[in-house]
């Protein structure tokens, strides 16, 4: 859902958005855990953004998926948005196991990323330190969940806020930036 919101932000405000790995539930062990959550608070947002969101059973960790996404980002940056969309659909539409290296490779099958590279990186957890470092940076900003948005390197906004909220925040930051520019 954050990606759908980000598309709207880009269209409305011509902003650049950088994505950083952040495990939603780092405490979930390999194999996943029973999921009793229905995410009912997110249903209206999913409907507004016209996206499908079915909670999976079990709820799986995302460590390997984040590592695979980092591989795609570095090996084929122009295809990373496609890969992230496929990860979303694998979890929330198709209920696939995004910790399975073969699933992660399959999601990139037609991308310009070597299958063997994704498989090796996620099997050996080679980029797990990068995922953890990203989470440490997010925690330093005060992030406690996803999505969290850092705007202009000045303000961290938690959660899936609506378009009007972001309109107000971005307009306020632009006013501050303009006032600071006038003071120079």
Q: Model-derived features: where do they sit?
A:
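Conserved beta-strand termini and adjacent loop/short-helix elements that scaffold enzyme active sites
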Residues: 20-22, 56-58
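Short, charge-patterned binding micro-sites
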Residues: 21-32
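Short, structured active-site "lid" loops
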Residues: 34-51
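Short glycine/proline- and acidic residue-enriched helix-loop micro-motifs
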Residues: 48-54, 116-121
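A glycine-rich, coil/turn loop motif that links secondary-structure elements
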Residues: 57-60, 97
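Conserved N-terminal beta-strand and adjoining loop/helix that marks the start
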Residues: 64-68
């Amino acid at each position: 859902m954050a990606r759908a919101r980000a598309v709207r932000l880009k269209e409305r405000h011509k902003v650049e958005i950088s994505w950083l790995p952040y495990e939603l539930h780092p405490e979930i062990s390999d194999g996943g855990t029973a999921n009793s959550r229905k995410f009912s608070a997110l249903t209206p947002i999913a409907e507004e953004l016209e996206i499908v969101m079915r909670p999976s059973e079990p709820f799986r960790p995302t460590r390997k998926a984040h590592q695979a996404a980092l591989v795609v980002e570095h090996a084929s940056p122009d295809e990373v948005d496609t890969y992230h969309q496929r990860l979303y659909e694998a979890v929330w539409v198709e209920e696939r196991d995004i910790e399975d290296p073969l699933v992660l490779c399959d999601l990139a099958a037609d991308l310009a990323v070597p299958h063997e590279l994704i498989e090796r990186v996620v099997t050996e957890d080679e980029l797990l330190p990068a995922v953890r470092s990203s989470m440490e940076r997010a925690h330093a900003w005060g992030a406690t969940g996803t999505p969290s948005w850092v705007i202009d390197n000045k303000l961290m906004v938690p959660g899936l806020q609506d378009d009007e909220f972001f309109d107000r925040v971005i307009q306020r930051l632009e006013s501050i930036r303009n006032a600071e520019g006038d003071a120079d």
